[in-house]
Amino acid sequence: MKRTVFPLAVAAALTLTACETILNNLPGVYSIDIEQGNMIDQAMVDQLRPNMSKRQVLYIMGSPMLTDTFHERRWDYLYSDQPGGEARVQKRISLFFDGDNLIGVQGDFRPSKLPVIKESTETTVDVPKRNLDKTMWEKITGLFSNDDSGEMPVKPESKPSDLLNE
């Protein structure tokens, strides 16, 4: 009996490991989203224009995923997304430079020929001017005065000539 159980257990283990794709698709099993590389979208690529400097391209696109030491004129951006165990989607774009200026774009994205119109997210709020009868200081000092008018008492100014006459 022991001699037949061991080969059956080994055969069952080998058979189950071959069913990895079946085990990945079991209902109720959570699979994480896997994103790798530079996140690239069409809005970023639409901002690229010929003769842009490398610094401007870095500001728009971020650091390239690959900079080949043998092809310094070429920057490669790769993005891979595999949401929840589904099929992997990979996008790439290569930018070509002549010296410091952008001369070409190649890959899954193409810049549009329309100018980029950026919608403003700023809003202006008009706050109406408040009509204050009294300042805070006038209100505080008005609590201690006997005057019903609420005005602050004014100290008469003494002139230097008045001091000499005394």
From Swiss-Prot:
Which Pfam families does the annotation name? BamE
Q: What biological function has been recorded for the protein in this entry?
A: Part of the outer membrane protein assembly complex, which is involved in assembly and insertion of beta-barrel proteins into the outer membrane.
Q: What is its main location?
A: membrane
Q: Which family does it belong to?
A: Belongs to the BamE family.
User: HAMAP family from the xrefs?
Assistant: OM_assembly_BamE (MF_00925)
Q: Which gene encodes it?
A: bamE
Q: Which residues form the signal peptide?
A: 1-18
One annotated Gene Ontology cellular component of this protein: Bam protein complex
Residue ranges annotated as transmembrane are: none
Put simply, this protein is called Outer membrane protein assembly factor BamE
Under the subunit heading, UniProt states: Part of the Bam complex.
Cite the residue spans of the region called Disordered: 143-166
Provide the membrane topology annotation.
Answer: Lipid-anchor
Native species: Methylomonas methanica (strain DSM 25384 / MC09)
Residues annotated for lipidation of the kind N-palmitoyl cysteine are 19
Q: Membrane: present as a keyword of the record? A: yes
Q: Name one GO molecular function term.
A: protein-macromolecule adaptor activity
The record's section on InterPro entries has: BamE, BamE-like, BamE_dom
